């Protein structure tokens, strides 16, 4: 089974922090063979108060998804992500088919 991050967040409020997160994320994502699929269309909100965007990140395994999140290099990147927007990140195991 594959591992996933599901990131649900409000619209980006700090573009500079988001750009720094993206810069730091690239080598980390490559290290863990992550593939992301940011939604270009806002999700249809049916049972929540606020959700501006959804990103699905696919990993080869649940262990890889957890290890990536726990990687010290991601700690630095995460600071910028949390500065850029208010978000929720869930880690789960499954098979969603083609994510990218």
Q: Which residues does each predicted region cover?
A:
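Short S/T/G/P-rich N-terminal loop/turn motif that feeds into the first structured element of a domain
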Residues: 1-53, 60-70, 93-100
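C-terminal structural segments of small proteins and small subunits
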Residues: 66-70, 74-90
């Amino acid at each position: 089974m594959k591992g996933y991050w599901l990131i649900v967040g409000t619209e980006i409020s700090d573009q500079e922090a988001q750009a720094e997160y993206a810069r730091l994320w690239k080598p980390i994502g490559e290290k863990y063979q992550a593939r992301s699929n940011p939604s270009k269309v806002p999700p249809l909100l049916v049972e929540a108060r606020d959700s501006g965007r959804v990103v699905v990140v696919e990993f080869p395994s649940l262990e890889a998804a957890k290890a990536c999140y726990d990687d010290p290099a991601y700690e630095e990147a995460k600071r910028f992500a949390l500065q850029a927007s208010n978000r929720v990140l869930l880690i789960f195991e499954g098979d969603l088919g083609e994510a990218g």
